Regions:
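Active-site hotspot residues in diverse enzymes, especially metal/ion-binding acidic/histidine motifs
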Residues: 1-149
C-alpha cells in the first residue's frame, strides 16, 4: 500500500508535469478549483467544498504577489487534492506546526510543491534562516521539506 508521503510526492509530480509549473494558483485552475479572496479576520485561508465545487478562500489582506499567498494557496491546494470532503481553515498565526494528520499532510504538500529538489540544491550552502530570507517562505516550510526528503 502506498504511504501518504509517496502519494504526496506523486501528486506534486503529476500536477507539475501536467501544468508545467509549480505555481499553486495555476495548478488549482487546472484542477478546477476556484480561488477567491475575501475578508477572513484571523484566518489566512481555507478550503471548502460547496455543491461539489472545490474552493480555496484566501484572506484579502494577503497580497497576491507575496510568498505567504503562495504558501497559503499551496497548503489549501493540498487539502483540496488530499482531503476533498474536509473543510479546512488555515489560521493566520499558524506556524505550520504539525497539529493534526490532515494539517501535516497539507503542509507537506505545500513544502514539496514550493521547494523542489533543485531549489534545495541551489541553497544547500545556506542556513534555513538564509533560505527563508531569500525566498520569503516560513522556516517551518523548509524544515518540513527537508524532513521528508
Amino acid at each position: 500500500m502506498e504511504t501518504i508521503d509517496h502519494k504526496i510526492c506523486r501528486l506534486v509530480r503529476y500536477y507539475v508535469r501536467m501544468v508545467g509549473s509549480r505555481d499553486p494558483v495555476a495548478i488549482a485552475k487546472f484542477a478546477g478549483i476556484g480561488i477567491a479572496t475575501m475578508p477572513l479576520s484571523n484566518v489566512a485561508g481555507y478550503y471548502t467544498l460547496v455543491q461539489r465545487k472545490r474552493w480555496i478562500c484566501i484572506n484579502e489582506d494577503i497580497p497576491s504577489d507575496s510568498p505567504l499567498f503562495k504558501v497559503v494557496v499551496a497548503h489549501e491546494l493540498g487539502h483540496a487534492l488530499l482531503h476533498r470532503k474536509e473543510n479546512c481553515a488555515f489560521i493566520r498565526k499558524h506556524t505550520l506546526l504539525l497539529t493534526s494528520g490532515i494539517e501535516r499532510e497539507a503542509n507537506q504538500f505545500a513544502a514539496e510543491l514550493l521547494i523542489p529538489d533543485d531549489m534545495l540544491q541551489e541553497y544547500s550552502g545556506c542556513t534555513s534562516d538564509q533560505f527563508c530570507a531569500c525566498t520569503g517562505y516560513p522556516k517551518e516550510l523548509i524544515d518540513i521539506r527537508t524532513k521528508y526528503m
